[in-house]
Amino acid sequence: MNDNQLLRYSRQIMLPQCDIEGQQKLLAAKVLIVGAGGLGSPAAMYLAAAGVGSITIYDDDKVELSNLQRQIAHHTPDIGIDKVISTRHVLNNLNPDVNVNAVKKRLLGEQLNFEVNAAEVVLDCTDNFATRFAINKACVIYQTPLVSGAAIGFDGQVAVFTPGKNNSPCYNCLYSSEGDELQNCASNGVIAPITGIIGSIQALEAMKLIMSIGESLTGRLLLLDSLTMEWNSMKLRKNPACPTCGVI
């Protein structure tokens, strides 16, 4: 690390759990973020600010006025441009040392497999079941840690799945692929700060995994009801009959 990096990351480096070694791991890390909306915006910004060396972000949407209430990587002048472009601009301004690979595309098929295999950690910041299950399956196949977040209304949740380690369950152990489609912000609404809270926790969990510090949310589902400010943690167990991790 050079002198500028030592100063930029000094408040993290002074933490004994992080230290120089942890910061070097962050600088060398490659993270994949799927979704540049309410969750992906804060997650990407905090990971870039913290010094994650390479961030690849996928999203196929353009910025709309209704996004600006909660998607903090996008601003009024960005309306009509690709979300990944406005996100890359924000991340580059926040920390020019970070390599940002922004792709306007729905991440599917062989490209999904390639990106998941190349990443150290994957953050699922999407809002539809089909994409979530596809990401989860790829993470199980390549044993890439997955940090999954969701927010709707006043509620949020985060879980971490580490395939192949500690008998970890996968996303499909928690949710059936035959279930109803996820509720989304467009049809049900969402209070703005809950997306920031959940996206920030996703970033924190990713950093913990990269630096191998603390206790991750592996095997737990963290739930927040922001109307009452009650946090709950549910233990998750691997399903031996899971159609994804039970057969791979």
What positions do the PLM features span?
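Adenine nucleotide-associated cytosolic modules
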Residues: M1-I248
